């Protein structure tokens, strides 16, 4: 089952290195790029380039380059017409060998804001106009779990990985491009690094195709966490999602003061201690469809039929959150 993301949310899962792909719709102020991965045990360096074009030797508007070389540091620079500019350096290393990380680039009007594992790390002033950037390049001593472009527009023409995960590229036999009226939708503004417990209002209630995106980190000592789709006025819970670390992913509903029958069967549990996750929950006509890290996790048939009354999202437990969009 192919994962089809909502417009404005462009993920690629488990991409191979070197990663060299277009940025959907091009880079613009207000966009964010999320990179989740793991630094290799023998890591010496890696880089992320915001490039002006796809060719080798293309200008690089922003070069981000962590280096483990005895003087652990991160180097920042810009390349124009084959010449590197003046380096900026920060003698601090936010990455740990053998550890998972989340690296976020937020495109601000005056600079790129770099956030690592939820902590602000650096601001790099624009030397080239943001609108010139067309491609993202990543390579080096790391493993990639996912790359997400948030807030941009879909590319005018499809390319492999643009609207589906790599296992279902747009050019695959039997692939039918989704129609706009069948695409999932996100209606609320994104919230960055919200505190846990989190409570968010689902303005207008749940509707068919509405998709909720939750990106977070499972704490190393985690036991479980909870996501509830709730009716604020009655306390009914249309979907209670309870990942239990090292066990299973429990689903249930709470109606008229009573819990229903638990559902526990999943092919795999994607929530491990010390790992990042990317969760997509889509409301359908007769069920919720849930994807984790781009892979179908489970369906949950509606027990609470008046799902349009669901107006509250609750998240609590042994996690931190980096991004929620409802």
Curated annotation (Swiss-Prot):
<keyword id="KW-0677">Repeat</keyword>
<keyword id="KW-0430">Lectin</keyword>
<dbReference type="InterPro" id="IPR001079">
    <property type="entry name" value="Galectin_CRD"/>
</dbReference>
<dbReference type="GO" id="GO:0062023">
    <property type="term" value="C:collagen-containing extracellular matrix"/>
</dbReference>
<protein>
    <recommendedName>
        <fullName>Galectin-4</fullName>
    </recommendedName>
</protein>
<feature type="binding site">
    <location>
        <begin position="259"/>
        <end position="265"/>
    </location>
    <ligand>
        <name>a beta-D-galactoside</name>
    </ligand>
</feature>
<dbReference type="Pfam" id="PF00337">
    <property type="entry name" value="Gal-bind_lectin"/>
</dbReference>
<dbReference type="GO" id="GO:0005615">
    <property type="term" value="C:extracellular space"/>
</dbReference>
<dbReference type="GO" id="GO:0016936">
    <property type="term" value="F:galactoside binding"/>
</dbReference>
<comment type="subunit">
    <text>Monomer.</text>
</comment>
<feature type="domain" description="Galectin 1">
    <location>
        <begin position="19"/>
        <end position="150"/>
    </location>
</feature>
<feature type="domain" description="Galectin 2">
    <location>
        <begin position="198"/>
        <end position="326"/>
    </location>
</feature>
<dbReference type="InterPro" id="IPR013320">
    <property type="entry name" value="ConA-like_dom_sf"/>
</dbReference>
<dbReference type="InterPro" id="IPR044156">
    <property type="entry name" value="Galectin-like"/>
</dbReference>
<dbReference type="GO" id="GO:0030246">
    <property type="term" value="F:carbohydrate binding"/>
</dbReference>
<dbReference type="GO" id="GO:0042742">
    <property type="term" value="P:defense response to bacterium"/>
</dbReference>
<dbReference type="GO" id="GO:0002780">
    <property type="term" value="P:antibacterial peptide biosynthetic process"/>
</dbReference>
<comment type="function">
    <text>Galectin that binds lactose and a related range of sugars.</text>
</comment>
């Amino acid at each position: 089952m192919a994962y089809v993301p909502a417009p404005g949310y462009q993920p690629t899962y488990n991409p191979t290195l070197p990663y060299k792909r277009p940025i959907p719709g091009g880079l613009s102020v207000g966009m964010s790029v999320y990179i989740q991965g793991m630094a290799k045990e023998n890591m010496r360096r890696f880089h992320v380039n915001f490039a002006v074009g796809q060719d080798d030797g293309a200008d690089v508007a922003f070069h981000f380059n962590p280096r483990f070389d005895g003087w652990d540091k991160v180097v920042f620079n810009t390349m124009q017409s084959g010449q590197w500019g003046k380096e900026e350096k920060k003698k601090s290393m936010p990455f740990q060998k053998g550890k998972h990380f989340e690296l976020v680039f937020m495109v601000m009007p005056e600079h790129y804001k770099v956030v690592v594992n939820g902590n602000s790390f650096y601001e790099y002033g624009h030397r080239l106009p943001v609108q010139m950037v067309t491609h993202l390049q990543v390579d080096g001593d790391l493993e990639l779990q996912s790359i997400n472009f948030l807030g941009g527009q879909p590319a005018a023409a499809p390319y492999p990985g643009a609207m589906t995960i790599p296992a279902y590229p747009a050019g695959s036999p039997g692939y039918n491009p989704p129609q706009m009226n069948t695409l999932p939708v996100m209606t609320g503004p994104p919230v960055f690094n919200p505190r846990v417990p989190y409570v968010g209002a689902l303005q207008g209630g749940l509707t068919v195709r509405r998709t909720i995106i939750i990106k977070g980190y499972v704490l190393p000592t985690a036991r479980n966490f909870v996501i509830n789709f709730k009716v604020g006025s009655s306390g009914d819970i249309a979907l209670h999602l309870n990942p239990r670390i090292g066990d299973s992913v429990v689903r249930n509903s709470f109606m008229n003061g009573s819990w229903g029958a638990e559902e526990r069967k999943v092919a795999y549990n994607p929530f491990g201690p010390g790992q990042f996750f990317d969760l997509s929950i889509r409301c359908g006509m007769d069920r919720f469809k849930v994807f984790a890290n781009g892979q179908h996790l489970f369906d949950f048939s509606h027990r609470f039929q008046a799902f349009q009354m669901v107006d509250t999202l609750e998240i609590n437990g042994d996690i931190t959150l980096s991004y929620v969009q409802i």
